[in-house]
Amino acid sequence: MPYLITDDVSSKPDHRSLDVPWQSVGAKCVVTLAAKLMLAVLPPQTSFFKLQVRDDKLGEQFSPEIRSELDLSFSKMERMIMDYIAASNDRVAIHQALKHLIVGGNALIHMSKDGLKTFPLNRFVVNRDGNGNVLEIVTKELISRKVLDVELPEPQPNRVVDETGSEKDDVEIYTCIKLDKSTGRWIWYQEAFDKVIPNTRSTAPKNASPWLVLRFNTCDGEDYGRGRVEEFLGDLKSLDGLSQSLIEGAAAASKVVFLVSPSSTT
């Protein structure tokens, strides 16, 4: 699926282009598996969670009528949350993250006030400790200068510009997320041209971070995970090689050569 990890237009001109597969069997398998996982994570017309109060917190002083009223209120809240998810683009972001987890094994989801946003593997880096806990995250985004309300330096005349001309209109924004061990809170801010952008610093509790770094398969001692596709990499490479040979052989066999007839007058 070439659209999952695309070529970085802001990289160097000598950047090696990513390979395009010769078959789509792997893509069909990824789409099918992502759809099944999507039904398990966010089933349609069904709540995937339940709100309730623990019995040890309620005590025995509450009557059954009060308990039933609490259950009814919680059911209304569940429906409100499900309606909000259905009206937002959260399903699209989660479905995209599932594809990245299946193929690359890694995905980053940011839960903001505007909804969920998925970062592919070529748009973020992560650092973990020996136990797999996230210590630091850095993301990269291309944002138009018109959207930013801060003054930024103009691009240099001798700077490499891509064919689309996005180097003049877009700015590379880096978001740094760190865990402050002294306060036990997550701190993040944004930078552009090696300078911190004003009014971009935010914090969150350690157990309520809006940045979710997901891994499909966990490998001990590694910062990144491994995808489901890696388990079948040998079969996919063999299929891709055979498909390439079949396509190139068919193209060579279908070559048409026009010759002049000896009996013709021309």
Language-model segments: residues:
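Extended, helix-rich architectural segments
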Residues: 1-159
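Compositionally biased, low-structure terminal segments
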Residues: 4, 49-50, 63, 175, ...
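Generic detector of intrinsically disordered, low-complexity, polar/charged segments
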Residues: 23, 56, 101-102, 129, ...
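Short, well-ordered loop/turn elements at secondary-structure boundaries
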Residues: 102-105, 168-171, 182-183, 233, ...
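Structural beta-strand/beta-sheet cores of well-ordered domains, especially the beta-sheet scaffolds
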Residues: 105-107, 122, 172-175, 235-237, ...
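Active-site and NAD+-binding cores of ADP-ribose-processing enzymes
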Residues: 108-220
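Extended, charged amphipathic alpha-helical segments
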Residues: 187-266
